[in-house]
A protein has these predicted regions:
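Substrate-binding clefts and catalytic carboxylate motifs of secreted carbohydrate-active enzymes
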Residues: 68-158, 205
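Short, well-ordered beta-strand segments enriched in hydrophobic/aromatic residues
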Residues: 215-218
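Active-site-proximal helices and loops of the catalytic beta/alpha 8
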Residues: 1-83, 136, 153-179, 187, ...
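Alpha-helix capping/termination and helix-coil
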Residues: 94, 141, 184-191
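Short, solvent-exposed loop/turn elements at beta->coil junctions and helix N-caps
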Residues: 194-198, 202-203
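Acidic/polar loop patches that form or flank catalytic/metal-binding clefts of enzymes
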Residues: 14-15, 144-148, 188-194
């Protein structure tokens, strides 16, 4: 990070960290990724894990709220508001496939994945839940990052099945993504506004974004 800033002062270094950036440990050593020591921000894999667990019914809205608040409390604001919020990548199954199949962990072998068939009913479930996941992705602080093809409902389990040729399939989901991106680009409160998380019932998560006295978090 120091070397990058010497040459490119306004460049941002985003790290591939799969856990909480402020508490990450590996090989018995606590990593100094946050507080300006190593990274400007990171890929937000924990968001993907918790969103899918919530939408698949593996955790409650209260659990999801607790996770979101923990990130908000643990991360310095510049890092928090620059998180790369992703739902899919080349290292994990596509979000629509995860939500359609319910396979968030314990995936079958590569041979079994190659033969796996997602039915129309499963796909419709995945479609509906993916749109909810994307709503969370766009409404929490950070930078929404869409893995190519997710905007058109592409499927894929683990590599290489999540790296398929791009095709325009689900136009409804594409239009929903256009609405979300337009809304976020238009409303500054979704970019740098304050965030408040609530769980009024066991299944309902509420995300409130607001600006206080005409000032955002910065």
């Amino acid at each position: 990070r120091s070397e990058l800033k010497k040459k490119f002062k306004n460049y941002t270094l985003i790290g591939e960290v799969w856990e909480d950036v402020t508490t990450k440990e590996s090989y018995g050593t606590k990593r100094k990724y946050a507080l300006g020591k190593g990274l400007d921000s990171a890929m937000n894999y924990p968001l993907k894990v918790n969103v899918t667990d919530y939408l698949l019914g593996n955790q409650s809205a209260k659990d999801m709220k607790t996770f979101l608040i923990s990130q908000q409390c643990n991360y310095p604001k510049p890092l928090y508001y620059a998180l790369m919020n992703l739902l899919s990548s080349h290292d994990i199954p596509r979000i629509r496939t995860t939500l359609a199949t319910g396979m968030n962990e314990n995936l079958p072998s590569r041979e079994q994945q190659a033969e796996y068939v997602i039915t129309s009913k499963m796909d419709q479930k995945g479609k509906a839940l993916t749109r909810l996941a994307m709503a969370v992705q766009f409404f929490v602080p950070g930078m929404p990052c869409i893995y190519y093809g997710d905007e058109y409902g592409m499927h894929g389990l683990m590599d290489p099945f999540n790296r398929g040729a791009f095709f325009e399939n689900d136009k409804e989901t594409y239009q929903e993504v256009l609405r979300l991106t337009s809304l976020r680009n238009r409303e500054k409160v979704l970019q740098t506004g304050y965030a408040l998380y609530m769980a009024p019932t066991e299944n309902v998560l509420a995300i409130l974004r607001f600006i206080s006295e005409k000032k955002d978090v910065f």
